[in-house]
Regions:
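Residues within membrane-spanning alpha-helices of integral membrane proteins
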Residues: 9, 13-16, 47, 53, ...
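A short amphipathic helical element positioned immediately N-terminal to and/or at the very start
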Residues: 77-82, 121-122
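Extracytosolic (periplasmic/ER-lumenal) interhelical loops and adjacent juxtamembrane/interface segments
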Residues: 112-131
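Function-critical hydrophobic alpha-helical transmembrane segments in multi-pass membrane proteins
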Residues: 130-152
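Generic alpha-helical transmembrane segments of integral inner-membrane proteins
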Residues: 17, 48, 90-98, 102, ...
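Alpha-helical transmembrane segments in multi-pass integral membrane proteins
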Residues: 1-7, 14, 21-43, 57-76, ...
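Specific transmembrane helices
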Residues: 50, 55-59, 81-110
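Alpha-helical transmembrane segments and their helix-entry boundary regions
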Residues: 8, 76-77, 85-88, 139-140, ...
Length: 312
């Protein structure tokens, strides 16, 4: 029997804690002028979510392997994925409509009804992130499009082109990492770095794809993966800390290098945590482990509700 990997729970709990912290810090920044750097924590947190999601879903895709060429297998993957994510998403979409009606309509915020078709089909931030309504849903749109298109590429490549699964997996992963970098290099976004780049579907597939690359390396080189767990953890923390400092102190809004490569650097820092997180089977005593597991279990719902709660 395999031991439960608690390090992944800790990584998920840290990710949601950073997101919640950012939303609270944003309130204090707008109201009291607290340091702007604290409003960047969520960028790190969401990227941790993306890397972790890619690692876990990539593992499922590797387990399915060549069987993804069968329509029934591919369909079951999408249905199971949809059942895990869509009910909560659409529930909170409706809750946000009610939230606008009760709290935000009187403040003069526009009626979100014309925007709803975009949210239903995850188009609210496909090419740009401008909508004020249900703002935290941007990352869910990134994930839903990725997990529609990447398995679709596997299905078509296996069934129509007869490409060997591992070669196809790596080719699609490389495209999903490289293409967003090229798109970020080509864009001249008039918006700030966070809204114009990091929250746009077309510019973020690399954040998930790097997790798919990581799990494939884990499966291929398990001994080296375990041996490097502590050096990799230290390097990942250092990279994320440096990225966080730059986002708060530097000027990513007016830097081409930041627009193109900073998301990739944060991706790298996030994925470097995975060798430790994916091999850690104990979090110590129950006083620490139990709340970590609880936060990790409820992280998706916490993500959907915390911004709305903090702006009530």
């Amino acid at each position: 029997m395999h031991k439960k990997v608690h390090g992944l729970d800790l990584m998920r709990a840290v990710a949601i804690a950073l997101v919640v912290f950012q939303h609270g810090a944003l309130f204090f920044y707008l109201c009291y002028g607290s340091p702007v750097i604290w409003t960047k924590a969520g960028t790190i947190g969401v990227t941790l979510f993306f890397a972790l999601s890619g690692f876990l879903i990539g593992g499922l895709l590797l387990d399915l392997g060549p069987s993804l060429s069968e329509p029934g297998v591919a369909a079951r993957f999408w249905v199971r994925r949809a059942l895990r994510t869509l009910p909560n998403y659409y529930l909170f979409l409706l809750i946000n409509v009610g939230f606008w009606w009760v709290f935000q309509k009187a403040r003069g915020l526009p009626d979100p009804a014309p925007l709803l078709p975009r949210y239903v089909f995850f188009l609210q931030n496909f090419t740009g992130q401008r909508a004020w309504f249900f703002a935290e849903s941007w990352s869910l749109s990134v994930e839903e499009w990725f997990y529609l298109l990447f398995p679709l590429g596997l299905f078509l490549g296996l069934r129509l082109l007869r490409i060997p699964f591992k070669r196809l997996y790596w080719a699609l992963t490389a495209v999903m990492i490289g293409l967003p970098v090229l798109l970020r290099a080509a864009t001249l976004s008039p918006e700030d770095w966070e809204r114009g780049i990091t929250k746009v579907v077309l510019y973020r597939p690399d954040s998930i794809a790097i997790g798919l690359a990581a799990v494939a390396l884990f499966r291929r080189f398990p001994q080296a993966w375990a041996r490097l767990r502590l050096p990799s953890l230290a390097a990942g923390i250092a990279v994320l800390a440096a990225s966080f400092a730059y986002m708060g102190i530097g000027d990513p809004d007016h830097s081409t290098a930041a627009r193109v490569f900073l998301p990739l650097v944060v991706n790298l820092g996030s994925v470097l945590l995975l060798p430790w997180a994916s091999t850690c089977t104990s979090l110590g005593g129950r006083a620490f482990a139990v709340p970590v597991r609880a936060v990790a279990r409820w992280s998706y719902s916490l993500y959907l509700v915390n911004l709305m709660a903090s702006t009530t």
